[in-house]
Amino acid sequence: IYNVDKIVPEFVISTEPTDGGIDRGHRGRMEIRVDVKGVRCHGSAPERGDNAIYKMADILQDVRALNENPADDSVEIKGLVKMLDPKYNPDHYEDARFLGRGTCTTSQIFYTSPSRCAVADSCAISIDRRMTAGETYKSCLKEIEDLPSVKKYGDDVKVSMYWYDRPAWTGEVYKTECFFPTWINKESAPHVQALIDAHHALWGEERLWADDTAKAKREGRPLTDKWTFSTNGVSIQ
């Protein structure tokens, strides 16, 4: 639409579910891959090889720590919650607090081995990374590259980003990195205020609900909020 048809919208209304409110942004996301090399050998003498799965086990623990740790000096790996602190994110911490902290989780694991009786010579994982305001794909890749276990294994580890190149139903292929940036519209933006004013005029200041169950979940919540998951808004902003 943008590259070929040259359509440049002034604003876009996403029809993703909002739980009866008006959502004005959400975190970005990217898909990271970590590959580890080892040396295969027969399982009867594992000391002759170099088990890639064991190396990856160390990396997995560090990825978990990156997501779960606090941001103080008591830990070697400062957690992603640090981006809510103006000390680490002076220009964007307020937006980060609205959108929520970034997260990472291991979503897939792969390996190669000659058989069930051999030492694995490679192991790889996929990491689902959700990004808050102030984070970039470069900073997220560097966080993984700087993990103690990744540094420990040096050239045996490769950190990269996935690519999308799946053909559409027309056969068209738009190869693109698996990176979709964080986006946020200020509540004071004219198009956001127009939606708020329209909602107030039609239904009042509360979120919409159809029954008591929905009312219990929505009553008293801010009318304007954000999505927790990633919507197609990442390809629009």
Where are these regions (language model features)?
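Contiguous, small/hydrophobic- and glycine-enriched helical/loop subdomains that border
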Residues: 1-12
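Metal-dependent amide/peptide-bond hydrolase catalytic core
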Residues: 17, 24, 31-237
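Short, glycine/charge-rich beta-strand/loop segments that flank catalytic centers
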Residues: 10, 17-19
